[in-house]
Each structure stands twice: as C-alpha cells, then as structure tokens.
C-alpha cells in the first residue's frame, strides 16, 4: 500500500513539473520565432535597399526563408 501511495505521489509531482516545462517551452518558442522573423525582415530590407530587381527578392526569400518576402 505504501508503494502505491509513493508511486501516485511521485506521478503527481512529475506531472506538475512536466506541465510547467511544456508551458514555458511554448512561450519561448513563440518569442524566439518572433525575434527570428524580425531579424529576417531586417536582412531582407537591407538587401533590397542595396540592389534592385525581382531576382533580389527571390534570393532574399531563399536566404532568409521569410514568408514576408514577396513571392514566397
């Protein structure tokens, strides 16, 4: 009986810990993807300012993998 109570208690504590790690991981993923998108947009903006033409936007999309670029 003590083993069963111990196992159940252990399961409850581990479930709470895993839930917190999952929630914090999801929040971190959202913020890191937002930062990556902003950096990609900045790189694409500097590239398009230095050269002109539709091929430049294609190169930008291939390099940045940024869905905000035209044609991606």
From Swiss-Prot:
GO molecular function term, any single one: toxin activity
Which pairs of positions does the record mark as disulfide bonds?
Answer: 60-65, 61-69, 64-72
> Could you name the domain of life of the organism this protein comes from?
Bacteria
Question: Subcellular location, in the record's words?
Answer: Secreted
What Pfam families does this protein's entry cite?
Enterotoxin_ST (PF02048)
The protein's job, in short, is: Toxin which activates the particulate form of guanylate cyclase and increases cyclic GMP levels within the host intestinal epithelial cells. Highly toxic.
Its family remark reads: Belongs to the heat-stable enterotoxin family.
Q: What is this protein called?
A: Heat-stable enterotoxin C
Gene, per the UniProt record? ystC
């Amino acid at each position: 009986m003590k083993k069963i109570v111990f196992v159940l208690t252990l399961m409850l504590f581990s479930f709470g810990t895993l839930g917190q790690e999952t929630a914090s991981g999801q929040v971190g993923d959202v913020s890191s993807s937002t930062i990556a998108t902003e950096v990609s947009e900045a790189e694409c903006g500097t590239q398009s300012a230095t050269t002109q033409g539709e091929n430049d936007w294609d190169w930008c999309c291939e390099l940045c993998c940024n869905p905000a670029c035209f044609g991606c």
